[in-house]
Amino acid sequence: MAFPEKLKALRLENGLTQDELGEKLYLSRASISSYEIGRNEPTIETIIAISDLFKISIDELLK
């Protein structure tokens, strides 16, 4: 599963809206949306924050 699909799946599994995930990561809903559709890629800092939030390794997140 590619990163955009993985991010959306993790968000939905945890019962979060794009707005709620954005708040937890200090990002806008538009940023979350753009990651989920593959328009933009997050910074390494954001990848680390997502990994920490969902308690999964960066390797799991990106593979």
Regions found by a protein language model. Name each.
Residues A2, E60-K63:
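Short hydrophobic/aromatic patches at helix-to-coil boundaries
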Residues E5-K24, A49:
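Short basic helix-loop element that most often maps to the first helix and adjoining turn
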Residues L7, L21-G22, I32-Y35, L61:
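Conserved hydrophobic/aromatic packing and binding residues within compact polymer-binding modules
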Residues Y26-E41:
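Recognition helix of helix-turn-helix/homeodomain-like DNA-binding domains
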Residues E45-E60:
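DNA major-groove recognition helix of helix-turn-helix/homeodomain DNA-binding modules
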